[in-house]
């Protein structure tokens, strides 16, 4: 007879966070929006793939807008007032995600582009010949 495993229910504690940091990572294939508190603890996150977009539709601006709105929706109800936005990556959803965050009613204190740029580091991949 197999033993049943003891299930432990872990509930996330709802904390009021008046200030948060929103990280937008826009790659060529997907857009990931992560909301952290000032210490760096993840509060909420969403991606275009988690919103139901598959394949080539994940890198569209509309998918980035939907991911940003879903990541922020719960935090507005918890009382988020002010946020900083860190955007990284060359994807198509950068501007649309920022526009969705700005239209959500949160006061943006800082918008920073933190895309890593090489100082002539690794060799780039060869160009595609289609």
Curated annotation (Swiss-Prot):
Organismal lineage: Eukaryota, Viridiplantae, Streptophyta, Zygnematophyceae, Zygnematophycidae
Keywords carried by this UniProt record: Chloroplast, Plastid, Ribonucleoprotein, Ribosomal protein, RNA-binding, rRNA-binding
UniProt-recorded Gene Ontology molecular function terms: rRNA binding; structural constituent of ribosome
PANTHER family documented for this protein: 40S RIBOSOMAL PROTEIN S14/30S RIBOSOMAL PROTEIN S11
Keyword Secreted: no
Pfam families: Ribosomal_S11
Family of this protein: Belongs to the universal ribosomal protein uS11 family.
Protein's recorded name: Small ribosomal subunit protein uS11c
GO CC annotation terms, alphabetical: chloroplast; ribonucleoprotein complex; ribosome
Ranges annotated as spanning the membrane: none
Gene: rps11
Biological processes, Gene Ontology terms: translation
Species of the source: Spirogyra maxima
